[in-house]
Amino acid sequence: MCTAVNFQTGSHHFFGRNLDLEISYGEQVVVTPRNYPFHFRQVAPLTHHYALIGMGIVVDNYPLYFDATNEKGLSMAGLNYPGNADYKALATDKANVTPFEFIPWVLGQAASIAEAKQLLTKLNLVKINFSDDLPLSPLHWLIGDTHSATSLVVECDKDGLHVYDNPVGVLTNNPSFDKQLFNLNNYRSVSPRVQENSFQPATALNDYSRGLGSHFLPGGMDSMSRFVKVAFTKLNAPHSATPLEQVTDFFHILHSVEQPKNLDEVAPNQFEYTIYSSCVDADQGIYYYTTYTNNQINAVKLHNVDLDQAKLTTYALADQQTVNYQN
């Protein structure tokens, strides 16, 4: 399972996610320059497009992005959506895009949510595997840009494609986004502040602990619990003064729902855990990340790469723990 966050603070916009799985696929930071030719299975190729940076794997010289941001600050992340995602057959009047092409197809062409929405009006997410060894994953997507604090959720269900405006700027997994959003109604009394005694004011009920306003905030590893908790954390997060402080704030939001090993068994002796957490400064094109085995924040700068070349640039993850010994 996974968690994604869209966060605007001051003049900076941040977008990122936790990738929660039981195995690593050899993720790396991948920069796709403007002249790398994106070839698609059913639609016209993009031979010149916006440059991208994100996390993914490269197979047969093709970037399979888990999350990415383009040079204009438009960002996307794909999250697990099992049992609900329903990809379609080819349609003659639509842009037939496979899910593994969806991120580059949008980010290669759109500079904003408004432009992405225009592309989505003709989208048909089709069931075409990357290969026999790499079948499609059931996904839904969060999209954010640098122009507003709002974001989009895209889901392809049995009854068709749904594009939701997302007022809270977070996404996890099942159930569908509209149900996740409605579920927040059950937590309208949760607060970062101590609440007045409304149970029975005449009865002495003491604030015996700090944090009682968040007593009913869920803490499970399940996707509905994580949606509520990360929405609460994000919507109450500080708006710090400097970009680096804001990056730190963003990682604290993600880490509020990270998964340690051995707490979420998905198969006998196999446990889901947070493989990496990412945060992109979408205004500056800086991709920050931490990994399960290295809490230090590492960064790759999009604009330090030659963006007019035609070859992918990859960066192996710094996943060995770094300790700053002070004596």
Where are these regions (language model features)?
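A contiguous strand-loop segment
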Residues: 2-94, 127, 318, 324-327
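Proteins synthesized as precursors that undergo proteolytic processing into mature forms
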Residues: 93-129, 243, 247-251
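Short hydrophobic/aromatic-rich beta-strand segments that constitute the beta-sheet cores
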Residues: 76-78, 163, 287-289
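A short, polar/proline- and glycine-enriched secondary-structure boundary/capping micro-motif
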Residues: 24-30, 86-90, 162-167, 174-176, ...
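C-terminus-biased signal that marks the final domain/tail of proteins
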Residues: 2-5, 12-14, 128-129, 136-137, ...
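Aromatic- and glycine-enriched pocket-lining scaffold segments that form the walls
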Residues: 113, 117-155
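Short acidic-glycine loop/turn motifs at beta-strand connectors
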Residues: 8-11, 70-72, 145-149, 155-160, ...
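Short, surface-exposed beta-strand-loop junctions and turns on beta-sheet-rich folds
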Residues: 21-23, 82-84, 158-161, 293-297
